[in-house]
Amino acid sequence: RWWRSERFTGVVIPAEGEFAIITPYFEEPSVRESMAFGDDVRTWNEHEDPFALVAGVLKDHGLQRGKIAVEETVRHFIVDGIQQAVPEFDVVSGKPITRGCRMLKTPAEIALMQMANDVTMAAYRHVHANIDKGMLPADISAMMNQATRQLGGRPGFSMALLNDASAYPHGT
């Protein structure tokens, strides 16, 4: 699992040719472990500019100008860093590309989504049948997490709200 960080890790995917992953030096082992294919991993240290590596990948592919599409939720400091490193390129939203990729699902992806849904619904049924008077929200959340694990899932989060709190899931 990868989470957002103040340190840039990204993948440069040219229209033609092999992709390259850019990541902090200390992340290289876990990046390589998660790769199913490809082998171009370029690392940077704390005192180095990771966006210079983006420029290097583009140069290595013989690209001198054009558009760089960036996934729409990428944070500004990354977009700005790329634009500063390669001002001859236009950094644009990749939403038209990424949206299409996310909307289309293979049968295997649909099967995985169904399996996750089945685990979640079975965990809900277990929790519903086992809630007792006097239980605290933390007790209910723990029961949901435990049921999810016992069914082979990995709980991402669970939130149980009771009484007035259930009307204000994001606070007041």
Where are the model-predicted features located?
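Structural signal for well-ordered, non-membrane alpha-helices
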Residues: M121-H128, N145
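A composition/biophysics-driven feature that prefers long, compositionally simple stretches
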Residues: R1-V119
